[in-house]
Design a protein with these regions (language model features):
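Catalytic Zn2+-binding segment of zinc metalloproteases
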Residues: 190-207
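Pan-zinc metallopeptidase signature
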Residues: 240-336
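N-terminal low-structure segments adjacent to metalloprotease catalytic domains
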Residues: 1-103, 180, 306-336
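Acidic/histidine-rich catalytic neighborhood
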Residues: 205-242
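Active-site rim elements
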Residues: 60-61, 225-233, 278-284
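Auxiliary, metal-adjacent structural segments of Zn-dependent hydrolase domains
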Residues: 70-166
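Short pre-active-site segment immediately N-terminal to the catalytic Zn-binding motif
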Residues: 169-186
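Short alpha-helical functional segments enriched in proximate histidine and acidic residues
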Residues: 77, 194, 198, 245
């Protein structure tokens, strides 16, 4: 008994020591940040990785095949349910948290580049604060993101699809749900996003323009509320349609997965709740709900395939008012 207690105590001390060292490394990376721009992105990546355990990425051949099968099945089921044609990235990545940080440092840097273009010299203290904020945001997200379809906005490469395996494992355990079914559900959600961008070749450019306008306005000290509103409406359509088609296409029970995941979000500690609000995670949940209600009403009136008309051309996107009045959207889009 004493030996077991001693082992647990030693493991606890070792873990706390490791956490302390990692925290020191994260703080040191921020304080050592350099350059002239508003954010030292190299330091952001270093600090976020230091403050975040990478997680285990030891997968059996069966587990790797499970990811591949889930993605392939999701593609076929969503094509059939939604009546849209789309392709997936050539390779699906299964990542740990550090891999996700590395990929998204590049994304954040790309999206926020207008800030660097307009702000040539930044005081060291402000740069350290900006760097710390970005590192905290990425570290928090790296511990929570389960999967991600990346259309590579503002980039030149191919679209990407990846899953953060340690987070899927951890969430399935915390929620007390079957891991394989949970992983499959996440795959269907991310593939649903791939379907949207495949069905709407104009969508990446629209989002890029919205993001560039919003960030440029912020860099100039202003806030283009109309641009932000348009971006929010577009993202509400993106999130809502994905919810509709993943629910219609998924081949297993999922109500308990959604309920438990929502409970997990709502039951977070105060620091987590604050970060979710600052990062707009709560807004994304509202986008899910509002967008899904809109598309459910459209599907009920005319079928799931009719909802795909939203991606035929930019003008078919619902307005902010139409999101709460699906009949008005149906009358406008199908008046012919």
């Amino acid at each position: 008994m004493g030996t077991a207690a001693g082992s647990r105590r030693n493991a606890f001390v070792s873990r706390r020591a490791s956490e302390t060292v990692n925290l020191y490394r994260a703080v040191r990376a921020v304080t050592d940040s350099g350059g002239d721009g508003p954010v030292d992105w190299t330091a952001v990546g270093t600090a976020a990785r230091a403050a975040t355990a990478p997680g285990d990425l030891t997968l059996s051949a069966a587990e790797r095949q499970g990811y591949a099968d889930d993605v392939g099945d999701a593609r076929d089921a969503i094509r059939a349910a939604a009546g849209v044609e789309f392709d997936l990235p050539a390779h699906v990545e299964v990542q740990n948290r550090h891999h996700w940080v590395d990929a998204n440092v590049a994304t954040f840097r790309r999206v926020l580049s207008p800030l660097s273009d307009r702000i040539e010299l930044t005081p060291a203290l402000a740069r350290s604060a900006n760097t710390a904020s970005m590192a905290v945001a990425l570290g928090f997200l790296a511990n929570n993101v389960l999967g991600q379809y990346d259309p590579l906005l503002l980039g030149d490469g191919d679209h990407q699809l990846y899953f953060v395996h340690p987070n899927i494992e951890s969430a399935a355990t915390t929620l007390d749900v079957d891991r394989d079914r949970f992983r499959r559900w996440i795959a269907f959600h991310e593939v649903a996003h791939a379907a949207e961008f495949g069905a709407a070749p104009w969508l990446p450019e629209r989002l890029e323009r919205g993001v560039e306008t919003a960030v440029s306005e912020l860099a100039d000290g202003g806030l283009d509320r109309e641009a932000m509103r348009e971006l929010d409406v577009t993202m509400t359509a993106v999130e809502g349609y994905a919810e509709l088609v993943m629910d219609r296409a998924f081949d297993r029970e999922y109500a308990d997965l959604r309920e438990k995941l929502d409970e997990r979000r709502g039951g977070s500690g105060p620091v987590s709740v604050l970060l979710r609000r600052l990062l707009g995670v709560g807004r994304k949940r509202r986008q899910y709900e509002r967008g899904k209600a809109f598309f459910e009403a459209v599907a009920k009136a005319r079928g799931v395939e009719a909802a795909a008309a939203v991606w035929d051309r930019p003008e078919n996107l619902p307005t902010d008012e139409e999101l709460d009045d699906p009949e008005a959207w149906l009358s406008r889009v199908y008046r012919e």
